[in-house]
Amino acid sequence: MTLDIVFERYLLTLHAIVVAIGLIVYVAVARALPQRRDPSAAIAWVVALALLPYVAIPLYLMFGSRKLLMRDAPALLPPIAPAAAGDDEAASLWARRLGRSMGLAPAAPYEALRLHADGADARRAVLEVIAAATRTLDVCTFILARDRLGDEIAAALRAKAEQGVRVRLLIDGIGAWLSGRLDVGPLRRSGVEVVTFVPPFRSILRGRANLRNHRKMIVADAARLWCGGRNFAAEYFEGDPERGGVVWHDLSFDLHGELGARAAEQFEEDWNYATRRSSGAHLVPAPYRIVPPDASLAQLVPSGPEQVDDTVQALLLSGCFMAQRRILAVTPYFIPDATLLMALSLAARRGVQVDLILPRRSNHRLADVARHRPLRDLAAAGARLWFTPFMLHAKAIVIDDQLALAGSANLDLRSLFLNYELMVAFYEPADVVRFAAWIERERSAAVRYEPSEPGLVRDLSEGLLLWLAFQL
């Protein structure tokens, strides 16, 4: 009997030590690299570490990191003078200054912006940018599929490498697995450097299993940029007749100018992280030059674990409060956090016309179920919700005529708080109007969504999926 009591006390002591270790690990990681978690997520981790330490500690080490970088906060900037009526440059100054305060590169000039009308136009632009490279060609994507479109792009990359151009392909580890394990042998034999960003199994050992590089860009000679929401798979462009010919609507664009050099620097940072090289190993950053007063300006907005702030989220929140007339948004998945949902709702309540366009049915059924609760809240605030009959994969937001954000980030928790994402903030009013026109074209094919009250089972399932939304 005495031995049983001693053994029980030993087990309780050992359990208490394990719990203490788990909580110490949580506090130590949070102190070393502030994670800026939502309070509910922080509470959930603490409760799990206290009640289920043997399960929670390994999970936290594998999936718990959200931020990987800590740096000193930039100096605060002086107040902005009130903008005069019709002063377009001053109207968007808030967004540029916010970006700089978060450590982003300053807005850079660009020219020859092309918004691709459809998948065929986007495919031609991809091949044109690849063909234009004479020195360097950097490609970052989440998916490079083993289909007709993926094979065509891979062949173009091999051809460029054989011409002596330095070609680098950075593909996400999860994306490479989802797309059927790309055959990298022919690419590497042609001279293409191929690196997997955070391979799934190795990432578990590094505590990065929950982080994905969702960025999509092609940079030629650090001067031409192709960017947007399209993965390199047939359905994002013209479809593949052998797979049913399904075509998704998506948004991409290309341009020339100094913004391409900023994109090359961003690719270099991602490449160095994936290859574990020191930053700046191959690329000397282009100097910031004096920008002509009449230049069109845009700013790269990378978001993810390497950024101290949640940059896209911060711009969206500020945009909701700065908007005076309209907010146009298109996204395939809508699972915002409570703060962004409140900002959009408040904008609608004070008379800003808020239009949100989504596909009636996306390629993620669970996300479709989880979105209904925030959609009901937004509709109750006076926003207009639209469902397209086709799969809409575009990601863009327009604030008045001041700002257009376009790129890879969805309006969901994973894109806003976990993934490596890349958006471009356009400040040229004429180009902001062009993005708005693109979104309006998609809206013209949509049907107004009028939400209805859910039953008990649906309400419970929506709540459960929202709780699990980081994994969707």
Feature roles, as predicted:
Residues 356-410:
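C-terminal structural cap/anchor segments
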Residues 320-323, 337-340, 367, 371:
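Hydrophobic alpha-helical segments and helix-packing faces
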Residues 333-354, 359-360, 364:
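Helical hairpin unit composed of two closely spaced alpha helices linked by a short loop
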Residues 1-313, 318, 322, 362, ...:
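N-terminal localization/anchoring segments of enzymes in phospholipid and broader phosphate metabolism
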Residues 142, 331-332:
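Structural motif
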